[in-house]
Amino acid sequence: MPATAETASYRLNHVMIRIKDPKASLDFYENVLGMDVIDKHDGGDFTLYFLAYQHQKVAQRGEREAILELTHNHGTENDPNFSYHNGNQEPRGFGHLCVAVDDIQKACDRFERLGVKFQKKLTDGKMRNIAFILDPDNYWIEIISTSRPQ
């Protein structure tokens, strides 16, 4: 069903994933993927971090699109056996995030230099126009080109 007058102003504001160690996750999303923390909320036994790309210069968090919310439940970082289910093993569920880049080869070369773990490199498999990297919690992040053929 196409958008109607009632839904024309709707937009996807954010997606939330749970993280084990905020230091590792913030380092990854800020320094590997170039996102900025635009807001933070301390909720007692948990902390919420809201990250976005700064090219969308809107002051209010609610007016932005494509925000990533990282939820850290305090104490998980101290448990070496703790991990979150990333949705890509049984039982399957959540699949991946996706980041578009201007030059996918250059981005993947940079990820290699930074020691980022890959789930799928550009040279793997039949789909040679996408890659998948892994964040510190093993969430998959698809990397596509902004000029990717449709």
Model-identified regions with their sequence ranges:
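Vicinal oxygen chelate
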Residues: 1-8, 14, 38-39, 50-52, ...
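Short, P/G- and charge-enriched loop/turn segments at secondary-structure junctions
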Residues: 3, 57, 82-87
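Core segments of cupin and vicinal oxygen chelate
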Residues: 7-10, 16-69, 113, 121, ...
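Active-site/binding-pocket entry motifs
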Residues: 57, 73-78, 149
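Intrinsically disordered, low-complexity acidic/polar segments
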Residues: 60, 79, 106-108
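Active-site ExK catalytic segment of metal-dependent nucleases
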Residues: 71-73, 144
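A cross-kingdom feature marking solvent-exposed beta-strand/loop segments within repeated
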Residues: 78-83, 125
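Beta-rich, blade/repeat-based domains predominating
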Residues: 89-94
